[in-house]
Amino acid sequence: MVNCTSDYCVKDISLAPEGMKKIDWVSRFMPVLQHIRREFEEKKPFKGVRIAATLHLEMKTAFLLLTLKAGGAKVSAAASNPLSTQDDVVAALAKEGVKVYAIRGESKEEYYEFMNKALDIRPNIIIDDGADMVSLVHTERKELLDEIWGASEETTTGVIRLRAMERDKVLRFPVIAVNDSYMKYLFDNRYGTGQSTWDGIMRATNLLVAGKNVVVVGYGWCGRGIAMRARGLGATVIVVEVDPIKALEARMDGFLVMSMKEAAKIGDIFVTATGNIKCIRREHFELMKDGAIMANAGHFDVEIWKPDLEELAVEISNPRPNVTEYKLKDGRRLYLLADGRLVNLVAADGHPAEIMDMSFALQAKAAEYIKENHERLEPRVYVLPREIDEMVARIKLQSMGINIEELTEEQKKYLESWQHGT
């Protein structure tokens, strides 16, 4: 069953009550976004503003979209990943008046069809996750460019794409790299990805992590979190990295560091978090142990190269939900989780609510910042002002009952002076 109207396209609109329960549940653990929602409800900063979003459509993102709607915005949304949509949550959004077009398991053609439908509101602001919507506007929906004030981007992968657009001088409007805010990458990328990736792997496999060799490919903030939590679960952690500085940092953090070919021979579980293509490919599959498990924590399903796996396999099956078994000619079996897509969102519920509270507070404030400042911003990639980062941190600390120290006037003067020495 699929329910489609001009205002939404969802799997089953009757699932809305269950979706609303999920949204209500996570909202209780998102005090910063609650604070911003109350502010938006009072001030209506988005009255008359149209906002289109491409996000993982699950309960936390739903609360963000409803917060923007509470601020007076007309909101539309489509999925940023074909397999991360939660159909009951999407139904709830439709019932709440968000123009939403997403079905879990949608085809690639439907993915872009739904994104185009979300763009049909002719947005002033875009909220993106992976830069697909911004890219689509610049390639196939150029008629919308003059009405777009700016966009915000949630992910490392998306920011990389957008900086490439800026470098090539094709970016037509300002973009806020929310991913590059301290309150995003220090918490979401590290603690959020670290916990939710292992949540997805363990739900998909029901296997023990302790005692296994875990290979983490990429040691950015996401890789750091994945490695940290793997160690906490009792694994021996091996990091694969191309950046010599990050590789050295991983070694100083206590992890083994190897090339991919070396790690492929001994790994039990492989997790990619690079934002790049073909990080695990044929030459590595050929070296892996029987029973090796692979999962991806990067945005797109290109880090573990499935075409090579399919060519090597003599038989492909699904022994469990979200687990694909590739049987090779020599009898070895390799397992790919979540079809190589984001394991934390496909096989689990994504990041914890308390983490996304901070990230989505930044997204809400980024939309407000674009609305208030777009006339003076140039078509390039920006980072949110530090005061917004600090505001989110202070509200979060208050919600946790934590008081921090304040500088005295004497200390402030000392820090601003150059005259005090030895």
UniProtKB/Swiss-Prot annotation:
Q: Identify a single GO molecular function assigned to this protein.
A: adenosylhomocysteinase activity
> Carries keyword Methyltransferase?
no
Q: What pathway is this protein said to act in by its record?
A: Amino-acid biosynthesis; L-homocysteine biosynthesis; L-homocysteine from S-adenosyl-L-homocysteine: step 1/1
Which keywords does this chain's UniProt record carry? Cytoplasm, Hydrolase, NAD, One-carbon metabolism
Q: Which residues bind substrate?
A: 129, 154, 184, 188
InterPro entries listed in its UniProt record: Adenosylhomocyst_ase-like_sf, Adenosylhomocysteinase-like, Ado_hCys_hydrolase_NAD-bd, NAD(P)-bd_dom_sf, S-Ado-L-homoCys_hydrolase_CS
Q: Which cofactor does it need?
A: NAD(+)
Binding-site list for NAD(+): 155-157, 189, 218-223, 241, 276, 297-299, 344
Checking SUPFAM superfamilies in the record gives: Formate/glycerate dehydrogenase catalytic domain-like, NAD(P)-binding Rossmann-fold domains
Q: Which cysteines are joined by disulfide bonds?
A: none
Homology family: Belongs to the adenosylhomocysteinase family.
Record protein name field: Adenosylhomocysteinase
Organism of origin is Pyrococcus abyssi (strain GE5 / Orsay)
- State the gene name recorded for this protein: ahcY
